[in-house]
């Protein structure tokens, strides 16, 4: 029996045990986990410091180190997120529909747990607890495989959760942690059809592509965000400037940060020079521009074709000039990762056309792409942002981690 077989078998057994937990029992456990995270902050920070030291030694960028860092405030924020999940309405057992058919059968469709969820993710250690809390709230067991960069932080966080489960008399195997960060073990998890009911990868383009190519278990893709801001010819340019600055610079290392700027030719001469001046007062951003934009920006560099398809996760932004709304939409649909896209315009009909025609999970009018988030959307914590057109699209909250089951009651009916 392999390492993943052992974890998978334990998770499968645990999933059957926790499937019967009541809402009250689940909420009480989540609140206990939240308390334990705060109480164990020193331990978690000590383990996180090991990852931070390794990151510094390995030359990981400051932006990526910030994703990795855990402080008392950030741990308190993670704990608050767990409490918020406890406060969310429990979807398990909810009736999706119910009716009596022509044969007199009473048919009810209810939400039920998936069973065992596996998650492969990178860098951000808070994901481990976010994922556990959502899985547990929906009566699912979860297997977590984090990245090498955050191995000590993730292990510490999961250790705290497992201890809280044990103290509550609930099987600690409701959350499993894969300590082996090798690609071989990750790929074994991707094909563990005997145990895993759903796999959610959360990370960069390379991880997502590897999972798409090698997984044999059901997968929901998340994450990669080549997000665009299109500044229309009817845009309020002051508003557009603030939206671009926020979407690019507030937190560039996350998947809902803007990576590409598309500007209508009619306003480009006024907008781009002013945007460049405004943004550089706040943050040094490297603009990689097409030929027309390059002539209007003092510090821009020429863009390569690859730049328009890149999720930079850094203070870098590609710039494209277009001659029409249709061209903007076609351009975005060519390069989008179907995450979050935005238009800035005062023309309602053009805004509606953009929202209808752009193929993305979240399409904004006159707002930053940075709002694509489970809490902001009122879904609570998210396990990821789905860029597929499956049952789950956009921020994945509790309902995305459920399946449905038909309950049929009869009185001796047979089919003629």
From Swiss-Prot:
InterPro entries: Ald_DH/histidinol_DH, Ald_DH_C, Ald_DH_N, Aldehyde_DH_dom, G-glutamylP_reductase_CS, Glu-5-SA_DH, GPR_dom. Keywords: Amino-acid biosynthesis, Cytoplasm, NADP, Oxidoreductase, Proline biosynthesis. It catalyses: L-glutamate 5-semialdehyde + phosphate + NADP(+) = L-glutamyl 5-phosphate + NADPH + H(+). GO terms for molecular function: glutamate-5-semialdehyde dehydrogenase activity; NADP binding. Its main location: cytoplasm. Its EC number is 1.2.1.41. It comes from the Bacteria. It is found in: Cytoplasm. Gene3D superfamilies: Aldehyde Dehydrogenase, Chain A, domain 1, Aldehyde Dehydrogenase, Chain A, domain 2. It is an enzyme of class 1 (oxidoreductase). One of its GO terms (biological process) is L-proline biosynthetic process. Pfam families: Aldedh. Pathway: Amino-acid biosynthesis; L-proline biosynthesis; L-glutamate 5-semialdehyde from L-glutamate: step 2/2. GO terms for cellular component: cytoplasm. PANTHER family: DELTA-1-PYRROLINE-5-CARBOXYLATE SYNTHASE, GLUTAMATE SEMIALDEHYDE DEHYDROGENASE. Belongs to the gamma-glutamyl phosphate reductase family. Catalyzes the NADPH-dependent reduction of L-glutamate 5-phosphate into L-glutamate 5-semialdehyde and phosphate. The product spontaneously undergoes cyclization to form 1-pyrroline-5-carboxylate. This is Gamma-glutamyl phosphate reductase. It comes from Streptococcus thermophilus (strain ATCC BAA-250 / LMG 18311). The gene is proA.
